[in-house]
């Protein structure tokens, strides 16, 4: 702020005087100028950045100096050569990203009468910008891909059909391959790997139907599990009951009485506990069954469809239930007989009801042939059950056909005589020097 001379300012405590009006030229003389600044020393300023010495100016130029005249006027020196180019220095925008200014849209030219100018019609052979757009080309490419077999498309054929350059096709395939919708199957061949294009339109209905069937199968499986559990519990109670153990057998008539077994081949298997049964995959030609047991022998019988029965009970009377069919062992003579050793017969089984024509004979005991020792008796290998004491008709003329031959006396373990030792049990083996040592 410029202040006037002190002579013009009123002193404190004095009455201000009226200053006559003066013109600006009278107030500020023409020879008055700004005071000259005193030169500062070189150590007064501290350089912030290392500075290099400016290049020496060419002779006759004044580009690096701005001399002041006696009245503070800038003196410009004209260069001897070419004039320097004018450059606008943006000191405030250093380090900021340059944002291009949005150009002001130009308004449409409107005729004086207010009607828009008519557009110039294009030639019929010229394509519009929409026809050559990448979006429309992608739609056409996807349509060709959907019509191809197994989703495999030849890029050369697609470029010919779409009438475009091959690089335009590559622009589409690069994007689709990047989002994992297609994959390169071979050279110039791609395959669609996405979903939704080649799916059956009736798939949702089929999926719903399969879900309903799966639900029904789960209900059926649950019902079968309950039945299996109930049958297992009933079978456990049946087998653990002592009164039912003696009746744990089935007859031929019982098997043939089952309606589902009619006109079918029935094979009866009598196996010890823990017998393993394996049935491989069934084929149309044959059926294979594998039985394996480590607890004892397995007996297999065939139940024929037709059995020859006697004409009438009066023509051929039934034998007594107290007698059994003679076995091959009983036909051989024996040196001695022990009447105290008896085999239980079928007399304990209730006899059939008597008929008016013939009364049942009184029960009797038939002694079996005994040997010198109990070890010489052909003891059965399996525990005797109630089915071994049936009537003679079922025992002698049983309709069951055994697949294995009947056992003879050579298949049993016999005892030793008085003059025989333990080595006689191994007479069929050549032990050599083992007996000497």
Curated annotation (Swiss-Prot):
Q: Provide ranges: composition bias, Pro residues.
A: 351-365
Region annotation (Dimerization) ranges: 197-289
Q: Does the keyword Phosphoprotein apply?
A: yes
UniProt-annotated location(s): Nucleus
Q: Which BP terms from GO are recorded? A: intrinsic apoptotic signaling pathway by p53 class mediator; lens fiber cell apoptotic process; negative regulation of sprouting angiogenesis; positive regulation of transcription by RNA polymerase II; regulation of cell cycle; regulation of DNA-templated transcription; regulation of transcription by RNA polymerase II; transcription initiation at RNA polymerase II promoter
GO CC annotation: chromatin; nucleoplasm; Rb-E2F complex; RNA polymerase II transcription regulator complex
PTM note = Phosphorylated by CDK2 and cyclin A-CDK2 in the S-phase.
InterPro entries under this entry?
A: E2F, E2F-DP_heterodim, E2F_CC-MB, E2F_WHTH_DNA-bd_dom, WH-like_DNA-bd_sf, WH_DNA-bd_sf
Q: Where is the composition biased (Low complexity)?
A: 315-330
The protein's matches in Gene3D superfamilies, at most eight in alphabetical order, are given as:
6.10.250.540, Winged helix-like DNA-binding domain superfamily/Winged helix DNA-binding domain
Q: Where is this region: Transactivation?
A: 359-437
Give the multimer and partner information. Answer: Component of the DRTF1/E2F transcription factor complex. Forms heterodimers with DP family members. The E2F2 complex binds specifically hypophosphorylated retinoblastoma protein RB1. During the cell cycle, RB1 becomes phosphorylated in mid-to-late G1 phase, detaches from the DRTF1/E2F complex, rendering E2F transcriptionally active. Viral oncoproteins, notably E1A, T-antigen and HPV E7, are capable of sequestering RB1, thus releasing the active complex. Binds EAPP.
Family, per entry: Belongs to the E2F/DP family.
User: What does the UniProt function comment say about this protein?
Assistant: Transcription activator that binds DNA cooperatively with DP proteins through the E2 recognition site, 5'-TTTC[CG]CGC-3' found in the promoter region of a number of genes whose products are involved in cell cycle regulation or in DNA replication. The DRTF1/E2F complex functions in the control of cell-cycle progression from g1 to s phase. E2F2 binds specifically to RB1 in a cell-cycle dependent manner.
Q: Tell me what this protein is called.
A: Transcription factor E2F2
Species for this entry? Homo sapiens
């Amino acid at each position: 702020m410029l202040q006037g001379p002190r002579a013009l300012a009123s002193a404190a405590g004095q009455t201000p005087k009226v200053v006559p009006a003066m013109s600006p030229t009278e107030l500020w003389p023409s020879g008055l100028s700004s005071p000259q600044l005193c030169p500062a020393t070189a150590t007064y300023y501290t350089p912030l950045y290392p500075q290099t010495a400016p290049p020496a100016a060419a002779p006759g130029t004044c580009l690096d100096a701005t001399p002041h005249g006696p009245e503070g006027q800038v003196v410009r020196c004209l260069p001897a050569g070419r004039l320097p180019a004018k450059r606008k220095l943006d000191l405030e925008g250093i380090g900021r990203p340059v944002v291009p200014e949005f150009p002001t849209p130009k308004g449409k030219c409107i005729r004086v009468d207010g009607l828009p100018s008519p557009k110039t019609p294009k030639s019929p052979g010229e394509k519009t910008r929409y026809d050559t757009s990448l979006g429309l080309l992608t739609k056409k490419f996807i349509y060709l891909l959907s019509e191809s077999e197994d989703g495999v498309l030849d890029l050369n054929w697609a470029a010919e059909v779409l009438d475009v350059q091959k690089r335009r096709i590559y622009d589409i395939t690069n994007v689709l391959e990047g989002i994992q919708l297609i994959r390169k199957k071979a050279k110039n061949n791609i395959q669609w790997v996405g979903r939704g294009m080649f799916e059956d339109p009736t798939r949702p209905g089929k999926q719903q139907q399969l879900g309903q069937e799966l639900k029904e199968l789960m209900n059926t499986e649950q019902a079968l599990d309950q039945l299996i559990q109930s049958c297992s519990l009933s079978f456990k109670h049946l087998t653990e009951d002592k009164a039912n153990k003696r009746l744990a057998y089935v007859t031929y008539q019982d098997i043939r009485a089952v309606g589902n077994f009619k006109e079918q081949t029935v094979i009866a298997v009598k196996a010890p506990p823990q017998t393993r049964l394996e049935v491989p995959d069934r084929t149309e030609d044959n059926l294979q069954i594998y039985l394996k047991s480590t607890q004892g022998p397995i007996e297999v019988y065939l139940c024929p469809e037709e059995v020859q029965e006697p004409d009438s009970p009066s023509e051929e009377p039934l034998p007594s239930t107290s007698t059994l069919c003679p076995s091959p062992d009983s036909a051989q003579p024996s040196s001695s007989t022990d009447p105290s050793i008896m085999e239980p017969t079928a007399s304990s089984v209730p006899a059939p009801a008597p008929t008016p024509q013939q009364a049942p004979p009184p029960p009797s005991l038939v002694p079996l042939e005994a040997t010198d020792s109990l070890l010489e008796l052909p003891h059965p290998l399996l525990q005797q059950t109630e089915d071994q004491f049936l009537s003679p008709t079922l025992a002698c003329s049983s309709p069951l056909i055994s697949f294995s031959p009947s056992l003879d006396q050579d298949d049993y373990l016999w005892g030793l005589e008085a003059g025989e030792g333990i080595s006689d049990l191994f007479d069929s083996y050549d032990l050599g020097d083992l007996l000497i040592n």
